[in-house]
UniProtKB/Swiss-Prot annotation:
The keyword Methyltransferase applies. GO terms for molecular function: 4 iron, 4 sulfur cluster binding; metal ion binding; rRNA (uridine-C5-)-methyltransferase activity. The active site is at C370. It comes from Rhodopseudomonas palustris (strain ATCC BAA-98 / CGA009). S-adenosyl-L-methionine binds at Q249, F276, D296, D344. One of its GO terms (biological process) is rRNA base methylation. Belongs to the class I-like SAM-binding methyltransferase superfamily. RNA M5U methyltransferase family. Keywords: 4Fe-4S, Iron, Iron-sulfur, Metal-binding, Methyltransferase, S-adenosyl-L-methionine, Transferase. [4Fe-4S] cluster binds at C65, C71, C74, C149. Its EC number is 2.1.1.-. This is Uncharacterized RNA methyltransferase RPA0948.
Amino acid sequence: MIQTLTIDQLGHRGDGVSLSQGGATYVPFALPGETVEAEPVQGHPDRRKLLRVEVPSPDRVAPFCPHFGVCGGCAIQHLRDEPYRTWKRNLVIETLAQAGIDVPVDPLIDAHGAGRRRITLHARRGTHDILKVGFSATASHDIIGIDHCPILDPGLNGALEAAWALAEALTPVGKPLDIQVTATENGLDIDVRGSGPLPPKMITSLSQLAEKHKLARLTRHSELVLLRRPPVVAIGKAKVTLPPGAFLQATALGEQTLAELAMAKLGRAKQVADLFCGVGPFALRLAEKARVFACDSDAPAVTALQKAAPATSGLKPVKAEARDLFRRPLAPPELRDFDAVLFDPPRQGAQAQAAQLAASRVPLVIAVSCNATTFARDAKLLIDGGYKLERVIPVDQFKYTPHVELVAVFRK
């Protein structure tokens, strides 16, 4: 049954929200102030599929990507920039308010820069043996085949062509391939997962494809297939050779912005701990000013940091350790010598480590987060432990999505 709905607000996932039916009804791709026609979505009683915009919002703009609305990569290309920025900042404000945290939230910083420098493509042969390579569809496990994505860093030029070639060679049926592609200074770094055991002849074929597409490196489940040139990224003064499948911030400008915000708040700190350090996007920059202790559960990432730090001139000592901070967080006695601690955990946050920090006497804590909800939970622990949350700075590197980064400053 087709319904006519008035959209009252924009939800936290970028959906239009209608409150006219006695409860919240979510309509993807609709905007506040619009009157729309929509139909029910089977199995989702509170969701509707947008059929037509009868009365458009003055804030509506034409999406710039032909795949928008079908591809699940972007949620909100159809909103003017100013209200988009307001909505995204409000995601942080509202999440903190729901947790009972009242703190100044700065204006949103745009850190999209040149675009995304790492992507994960999916590939699978489906009906009639047709191969699809692309991103997941909106709210679905279907694959949307694409040959171009306008939000990618130019360093990923050739990524889609290489992914198609690899998928054609591996002919995935049933379970899809995951093809992670990262832009590096020496070319594309690709790690393929989901292929299962391969005969030597296929490994040779993949090596030839890597040569043809001039990949820096090709790995399969992190095992080397071909190394043409080291996949290197610049982090501050350092050059880091990435381990296969390494985590990086989504954009180069995003990483730089987060690091510069953190460094600006560290003042004259001489001993700094960088927790959940990864390959060192903070540690290698912090070491320009202070001695750094860094740790993370990702042993290959820590090894990459350990190699890069002593090879970079002008840095103070960096000690790095592989350690699972979810199971073995640094305890107050281990934290007592630090002037400042920075932590940048995955989306699940750092509850165990935040509890230990709350019991410590570290005078300055900088939190970096990609999930406002888990940040709010961890921030409450620090506040209850005597820290004052001074400010929160939202950073937008996942542009056109509901995801937002933030940097927060705590003092005791």
